[in-house]
């Protein structure tokens, strides 16, 4: 079972999903869990199957003291770059919380200060602390739902399966059908970028 970072202060865990995708938003979540929260299944969202992720999504939504989820969409990603967009998404998720935490813990190694609240970046934090793991699950499940929704609009890219990640199938579809409004124009969508007509 994962640990709490500090039970004496209010800590929000933050994480993002979709940073490496060619299409769709980068999505972040921030979660404050009650100190009595326990769940043996809770872990980094990447290690969980769909059934467990969906179960935990509902559990976190029901039992979190407060949580926030935010998307940063393609235009902003292209304008400010994916790292800044990922941090912006986490800031926006924190803004949605019902109150500010005393401390923020973030998965990974890059973050920018949010409202002068102390923070710590923790590499592989989603496999160490419950609030970051909870944030990773909300970020992934909310983003996956969005990608499944836009799949209906552009089924040729099979986003319901690849979720916008750079799979062979996704790149083949880009080569065949071109780019959509959901693609990140600043990303290298194909090995030979010159062949894409924006």
Swiss-Prot record:
Cell compartment(s), UniProt: Cytoplasm
Cofactor: Mn(2+); Mg(2+)
GO terms under biological process: DNA replication, removal of RNA primer; mismatch repair
GO MF entries: manganese ion binding; RNA binding; RNA-DNA hybrid ribonuclease activity
Location, primary (coarse class): cytoplasm
InterPro entries, sorted: RNase_HII (IPR022898), RNase_HII/HIII (IPR001352), RNase_HII/HIII_dom (IPR024567), RNaseH-like_sf (IPR012337), RNaseH_sf (IPR036397)
Reactions performed catalytically: Endonucleolytic cleavage to 5'-phosphomonoester
Coiled-coil ranges (or none): none
EC number(s) per entry: 3.1.26.4
Binding site for a divalent metal cation: 15-16, 107
Domain RNase H type-2 per the UniProt entry, residue ranges: 9-198
Annotated PROSITE patterns: RNASE_H_2
Record's function text: Endonuclease that specifically degrades the RNA of RNA-DNA hybrids.
Family: Belongs to the RNase HII family.
Protein's UniProt name: Ribonuclease HII
Protein species of origin: Christiangramia forsetii (strain DSM 17595 / CGMCC 1.15422 / KT0803) (Gramella forsetii)
Origin organism lineage: Bacteria, Pseudomonadati, Bacteroidota, Flavobacteriia, Flavobacteriales
């Amino acid at each position: 079972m994962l640990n709490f970072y500090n039970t004496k202060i209010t800590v929000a865990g933050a994480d993002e999903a979709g940073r490496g995708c060619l299409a769709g938003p980068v999505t972040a979540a921030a979660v404050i869990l009650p100190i009595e929260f326990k769940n043996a299944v809770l872990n980094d969202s990447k290690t969980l199957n769909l059934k467990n992720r969906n179960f935990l999504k509902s559990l976190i939504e029901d039992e979190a003291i407060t949580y926030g989820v935010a998307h940063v969409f393609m235009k902003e990603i292209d304008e400010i770059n994916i790292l800044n967009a990922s941090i912006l998404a986490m800031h926006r998720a924190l803004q949605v919380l019902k109150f500010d935490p005393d401390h923020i813990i973030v998965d990974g190694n890059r973050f920018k200060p949010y409202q002068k609240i102390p923070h710590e970046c923790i590499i592989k934090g989603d496999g160490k602390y419950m609030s970051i793991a909870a944030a990773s699950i909300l970020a992934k499940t909310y983003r996956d739902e969005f990608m499944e929704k836009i799949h209906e609009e552009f089924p040729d890219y099979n986003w319901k399966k690849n979720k916008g990640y750079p799979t062979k199938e996704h790149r083949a579809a880009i080569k065949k059908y071109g780019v959509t409004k959901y693609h990140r124009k600043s990303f290298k969508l194909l090995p030979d970028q010159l062949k894409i007509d924006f």
